[in-house]
Amino acid sequence: MTPVIHTRDLTRRYGSLAAVNGVSISLDENRIYGLLGRNGAGKTTLMSLLTGQEFATSGDIEVFGTSPVENAAVLQRVCFIKESQRYPDDFKIKHVLRSAPWFFPNWDPDFAAALVTDFNLPLNRKMKKLSRGQFSAVGVIVGLASRAPLTFFDEPYLGLDAVARQLFYDRLLADYADHPRTVVLSTHLIDEVADLLEHVLLIDAGRIIVDAPTDELRGSVVNVVGGRDAVDRFTAGREVLHSDGIGGLVSATVSRLTDAERTAARDAGLELTAVSLQQLVVRLTESTNNEFQESA
């Protein structure tokens, strides 16, 4: 099966800065991917490359088996929702929705209308007069109702309150079940979307440092909690991603443990606690940043 997206050694430089650095990934059809990483990690630049909005400095990109750059046949199958989207000054919400079918062959006007009601949007208000949350909601509606085979959401929640964000997640998951496609979701609110994501791509300093199914990641690290001496003895010789403590109590984040190692930890009086996806991302990017600093 040909992947929806395939890149090899993809790089985008701005002067001496490599915003995307040697990225090689393959994304399959009909999966929800999380593209995670802190600000400036390269998420938006990578998505811009994959949607033909940026030119690569070097490396190869294939989207639906061919280059996306200036390729109408590919781009009509792609929807990229980003915070910086611009519209003509006189455009109202209704104009955005009316023009959408020109760009997205699978556009569902009935679904779009239902979402407008869900988000309580004023159709006759100009885009430039919308609140940040309303502006984001319009993007969410376009991304969902486009039903594009490949849909990117770049920080779609900006300005949305908790209720509106949950509405987005619920509608995304329900519509994905009925109309499967490949969705790439970039967000900082990782724990909110953790149950949506089937696969995680973690980018840091322009490099992909994690490319794995979400279920596999959930058990890849664990917190070892207990007295300082006992934790130090147990973690001796292991890679410790993070460690902190209060008084004599210490928590150390370590890589996957075998069943025998888990038993040994408990026999030593240590407690093992799960690490959330958000904590995992933080720990891994901290670890990678430390490696970069040490090699500099």
Residues covered by each model-derived region:
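Walker A (P-loop) phosphate-binding loop of ABC-type ATPase nucleotide-binding domains
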Residues: 37-42
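C-terminal coupling/interaction segments
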Residues: 242, 246-296
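Conserved ABC transporter NBD signature motif
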Residues: 27, 58-73
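ABC transporter nucleotide-binding domain
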Residues: 168-257
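Helix-to-loop junction immediately C-terminal to a conserved catalytic motif
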Residues: 51
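ABC-family P-loop ATPase nucleotide-binding domains
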Residues: 82-138
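Catalytic Walker B motif of ABC-type/P-loop ATPase nucleotide-binding domains
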Residues: 151-155, 160
